[in-house]
Amino acid sequence: MKIAVIGTGYVGLVSGACFAKMGNSVICVDVDSKKIEALKNGVVPIYEPGLADIVSECYKNGSLKFSTQITEALEHADVLFIAVGTPMGADGQADLKYVLSVAKSIGENLNKPLIVVDKSTVPVGTGAKVHEVIEAELKKRNLDVKFEVVSNPEFLKEGAAVEDFLKPDRVVIGASSEWGFSVMRELYEPFMKNHDRLICMDVKSAEMTKYAANSMLATKISFINEIANICERVGADVNLVRKGIGSDSRIGYSFIYPGCGYGGSCFPKDVEALIHTARQNGFEPELLNAVESRNKAQKRVLFDKIYNFFGGDLKGKTIAFWGLAFKPNTDDMREASSLTLIKLLDEAGAKVVAYDPKASEEAKKYMPNLDVKYAKNKYDALNGADAMVLVTEWSEFRSPDFMEIKERLKNAVIFDGRNQYNAKALAEHGFKYFQIGVKA
């Protein structure tokens, strides 16, 4: 099938590359000419396991092309995916200016039947707005061209996006006609060889499904962090509590890992957008409000532990960071917990030396005015530091040489924001070890 993807960010590039890998003819379009030139030269702007190899392979065999011209995409495509950003506005509402700009360009240049697919995460009712914009532009040109706007939200996990796309646990399609459903069924059929995981519904329900899914996952994270805070105060161990509740099949273990808060491009933005949607429609979402406020508070928890340990005086202290990205296997720094913690430490007069396997360069863009030094490896970050903080649970941090850590640190102190280590073993090594949800 001939496919166009507008936007070469995280969602757009993964989608375009994976569709090309499955034998489709794909053209990815972006207004950023530097990004397009970089992609043509084999430089992938985001880190995602397996993505660079697919982009390189498909570009070389001609199944994947890159362009800055939407007219080229419209001449090519039977199906066009809108995968541009929907940043959060000052009021918490998703900003649709990029989505609607693409819709306007489609209407201005469309000359043949087309399925337009909203792949971006958009508020309920966006599909109708996109349809209106395209239709209005076609009327200005006195054209009656067949098109349909379909919703096909993405459910990709950063760090496992390629595998998620190629082996989806479900594909949600929101359409308004059998034409839309049939085209999307044909497109996704190669991904459904073992099980039919296509779920068809109306457009608004598909749009809502994305927000509901992310908000549910965020709720689980905030819930276990709430429990963790209670555990610390009553003397319980949240790690054991997690096992006790996770073994219940009705609950499960997914997303009930206590930590220093969720981040990334999806959960914070989508929870806030759903809160805004609810309020716009006369409903106060008390549970979602609590999910959001708990997460904001959770991002301070590690700072409070560090601050209290040093008696409220952090001036001149050096804190070593292991991990900066909002989660492992990505270089994404959007809404990362490390950003909140580093800012608080900086305000308190502390210095930071950080190491992340993939996100250090990206982190520099988010903290241009903060005095953060970046180490070349995890052990070098520790040299002479007053304490170590683990923020991102990269696999290379799982089984470190604790004697090496102890020798390099000024004080044998670890603040663990992801509860990765064995407290008893660390105590035997002479460490003071602080976790989330466990009284020190």
Which residues make up each language-model segment?
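Structural/interface elements that position substrates and couple domains in central-metabolism enzymes
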Residues: 1-440
